[in-house]
């Protein structure tokens, strides 16, 4: 009887959501996975981007559930290369080869605001899910009468840290950059060295103004979608709701919803290498798709990994700088790579890799990371204790979550925030620190055992969150039901 009733029901028009992503690999991947997650639920999802970014997005979509494609599409806005002085095809911050390209890409994104608005009007969506770096979408959404929801690539904890800092200005109460500050009113006692706060927090810059615009736009938004899950940051989710009054939907880990099946030509050789290693014996090392260390820091990383006594996979982006010629003659990344190949002690990879494929391999037992939110969350989902090496963005906040709150990792001892163009220039982390941190996390001591136990529990909780009845799954249903209600009210 029930099946006959269902068969005669008039199908509802599917919801339509437009997604806007900042053109940088990490942001794009998480937006694609979020759009794919909603597409699984029958939502018509449209990602708006520029032509050069299509191959990355297409590849990311093809690695997910095949049924997603009927509900997920890509629409294009041309990028103004000539107007901003960039060569054709440079439309992504990950493609930057010199510092002056970044502001040109940003200028290009501002130029295409109007054609992007026109395209959104043509699509006539029920909701705009916007990367935080498009604050203009807040007023635009109000203009066309649909909810604008912010997509946050980071978690609740760093958002709460930033709210505490901008509300209470604890950094202004100390004189020296090497002094510690306490972040007031947070659920846990959080201390940070002043020098690890972003430079635009310590001293006003153009980026400070942008962040004020982003914060103001967020407060005018309908709510925030966050790639996290309740059991990871429940106290901070409640804190954020209370201090901002915003609706929050934690829907992660996003990567678990879509069942990403990453493959890459040549990856069979890497898997074969890992298959020959013992359970939990290899540490995975990666600093994301943007960071490039200068030669002297690469040398310290190499020495620290080698002397740790643990096998490793190191995914590296070498700096374009040549460094000191005498040092280059004595040591080079290529020489180290060949040495590790001969000793079978390490795998050095100088290209993009399917990270989840590595993290989920049984031989991987830990991770050395820049603590970018997405990478950190993938490590936690895989049940790996972390060695933290924050560099920029919200990564120093993430380190405090990992080390002080969750207690699932240790830091290498970074003491100063750096911009993308200053990586490895302000501060050099010595091989001794790297070796000691890797030994601690990968060792068999009580502290390491406790970390592994805690992160395994979080891993299980992350998987439970995305199952039917789990917190993230429920939040997705609540979000889509709310959009349906809002659409009905608009059409009434």
Swiss-Prot record:
What is the tissue specificity?
Mainly expressed in flowers, flower buds and young leaves, and, to a lesser extent, in old leaves, stems and roots.
Active-site residues, Swiss-Prot/TrEMBL: 27, 131
Could you say which residues bind UDP here? 352-353, 370, 375, 378, 392
Swiss-Prot/TrEMBL GO biological process terms? glycosylation; saponin biosynthetic process; triterpenoid biosynthetic process
Q: In which pathway does it act?
A: Secondary metabolite biosynthesis; terpenoid biosynthesis
Q: What class of enzyme is it?
A: transferase
Cite the Pfam families for this sequence: UDPGT
CDD domains to which the protein is assigned, alphabetical: GT1_Gtf-like (cd03784)
Q: Single GO molecular-function term?
A: UDP-glycosyltransferase activity
Q: How is it used?
A: Soapwort saponins possess anticancer properties and are also being explored as enhancers for endosomal escape in targeted tumor therapies. They may also serve as precursors for vaccine adjuvants.
* EC number from the UniProt entry: 2.4.1.-
What are the UniProt keywords, alphabetically? Answer: Glycosyltransferase, Transferase
Family recorded in the similarity comment: Belongs to the UDP-glycosyltransferase family.
Outline what the protein does: Component of the oleanane-type triterpene saponins (e.g. saponarioside A and saponarioside B) biosynthetic pathway, leading to the production of natural products with detergent properties used as traditional sources of soap.
The entry's protein name is UDP-glucosyl transferase 73DL1
């Amino acid at each position: 009887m029930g099946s006959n009733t269902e068969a005669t029901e008039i199908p509802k028009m599917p919801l339509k959501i437009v997604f806007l992503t900042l053109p940088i690999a990490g942001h794009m991947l998480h937006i694609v996975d979020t759009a794919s997650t909603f597409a699984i639920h029958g939502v018509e999802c449209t990602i708006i981007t520029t032509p050069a970014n299509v191959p990355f997005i297409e590849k990311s979509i093809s690695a997910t559930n095949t049924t997603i494609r009927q509900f997920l599409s890509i629409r294009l806005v041309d990028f103004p290369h000539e107007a901003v002085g960039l060569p054709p095809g440079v439309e992504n911050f990950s493609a930057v080869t010199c510092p002056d390209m970044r502001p040109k890409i940003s200028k290009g994104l501002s130029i295409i605001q109007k054609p992007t608005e026109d395209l959104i009007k043509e699509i006539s969506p029920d909701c705009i899910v916007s990367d935080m770096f498009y604050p203009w979408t807040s007023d635009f959404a109000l203009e066309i009468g649909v909810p604008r929801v912010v997509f946050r690539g980071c978690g609740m904890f760093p958002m709460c840290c930033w709210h505490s800092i901008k509300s209470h200005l604890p950094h202004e109460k100390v004189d020296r950059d090497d002094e510690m500050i306490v972040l007031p009113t947070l659920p846990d006692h959080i201390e940070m060295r002043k020098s690890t706060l972003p430079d635009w927090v310590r001293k006003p810059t153009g980026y400070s103004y942008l962040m004020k615009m982003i914060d103001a736009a967020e407060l005018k938004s309908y709510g925030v979608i966050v790639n996290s899950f309740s059991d990871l940051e429940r106290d901070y989710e409640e804190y954020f709701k209370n201090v901002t009054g915003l609706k929050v939907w934690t829907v992660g880990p996003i990567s678990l919803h879509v069942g990403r099946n990453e493959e890459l030509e040549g990856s069979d050789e890497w898997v074969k290498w890992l298959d020959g290693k013992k359970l939990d014996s290899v540490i995975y090392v990666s600093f994301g798709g943007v960071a490039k260390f200068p030669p002297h820091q690469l040398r310290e990383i190499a020495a620290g990994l080698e002397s740790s006594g643990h096998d490793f996979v190191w995914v590296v982006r070498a700096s374009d700088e040549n460094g000191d010629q005498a040092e280059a003659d004595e040591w080079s990344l290529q020489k180290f790579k060949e040495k590790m190949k001969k000793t079978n002690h390490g795998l050095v990879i100088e290209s993009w890799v399917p990270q989840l494929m590595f993290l989920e391999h049984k031989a991987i037992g830990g991770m050395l990371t820049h603590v970018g939110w997405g990478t950190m969350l993938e490590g936690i989902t895989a049940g790996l204790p972390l060695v933290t090496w924050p560099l920029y963005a919200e990564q120093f906040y993430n380190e405090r979550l990992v080390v002080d709150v969750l207690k699932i990792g240790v830091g290498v001892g970074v003491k100063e925030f750096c911009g993308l163009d200053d990586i490895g220039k302000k501060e050099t982390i010595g091989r001794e620190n790297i070796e000691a941190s890797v030994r601690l996390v990968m060792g068999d001591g009580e502290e390491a055992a406790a970390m592994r136990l805690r992160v395994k529990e979080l891993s299980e909780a992350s998987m439970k969150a995305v199952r039917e009845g789990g917190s993230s799954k429920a939040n997705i249903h609540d979000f889509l039901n709310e959009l349906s209600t809002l659409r009905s009210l608009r059409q009434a």
